[in-house]
Structure formats: C-alpha cells, structure tokens
Amino acid sequence: IIGGGPKKRDRLGLYSTPPDCVQALLTAIDWRGDTIMEPCGGKGAIIDALRPTHRVGYSCDIDPQADGIERRDFLTLDSSMGCTAIITNPPFALFERFVRHAFSLGVTRQAYLLKVNTFSAAKRTGLFYEHKSFARLDLTWRPDFLGLGSPTMDCTWIVFDGVCAPICEYNLLERPE
C-alpha cells in the first residue's frame, strides 16, 4: 500500500470504526426515528457512537471475539429483528451481499462505511442501478482504523433509502471537531 506499507489483515475484516466517522453520518442524515441494527458489531464502536441519541435495536457479529453482542452471521438472519435501519462498517468483500440481504428483510434505510472506489468494480454496478435511491457521502479525512497515525484509505458512507426519489446524492462530510 503506497504511503502506509502492507498491513496485517484481521481474519474476518474486523476494524473498529472511529467515532468521528459515525458522528459525521449522524450530522448529515437524521436517524432518530429509526431503530438501528449493527450487523458487524465487533467491539461496539458504532453502537457506542449511536447509543447516546439513537435507538439501537439489535447488534450481532460473526466474530466469536465480538464484545457484548450476539454471535451470529447477519446473512443468516430471517427477520429484521424489529429494526428499520442498518448502520455498519462491513467487510468490504461482503458489502453487496449485506445490502441485498437487508433489502430482503425489509430494511430499506442502510448506511455502509466503505472504500471510496466501491462502485469502480464492474461487478458492483448492478447494485447501483437496482437501488439508485442512495447517497454517497465522502469523508474529507482518512479514518485511522488501525490507530497508527498514518491512514491511507479514503472512505465514504453509501446510504440506501427506499423512500427517496430515484437519484444518487453526492456530498462531502467534514470531520467533526
């Protein structure tokens, strides 16, 4: 990786989400009317950022070392667990499966923290064209997932909202103070 050197990957793609990433999303979109699911709960970073002001309905993770949440693969859920929205930082390789599964559960409000180039792969363009009611909210800083002080990955929130008009909104999110 240019600028950062190769990094050892977590076997399940688990990287704690810095709270400023979640705060920026919460500033851009109002989620207070939703009951939120976090299907990649990991160490609870997103849940911790949500809890003071938002309803968290359910959190799970496939990782047996996940803290204080149900150990379960989101892709095996057969109900929305009473949740109306998803906010998560999924393993990038599973993003499309997560989106499709969430829609199959009836969860139409979804936010995923992803690499900026997520839709650069031709195999993912189908998802874009099927669900154009979404926003792309690019972070104006590079999140430090590893806590090493020299992050190299540009990130964006991809937000699906089944009640929006069939358009794609693009915006920038400033880093919260």
Regions found by a protein language model. Give the residues of each.
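Class I S-adenosyl-L-methionine-dependent methyltransferase catalytic core
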Residues: 1-177
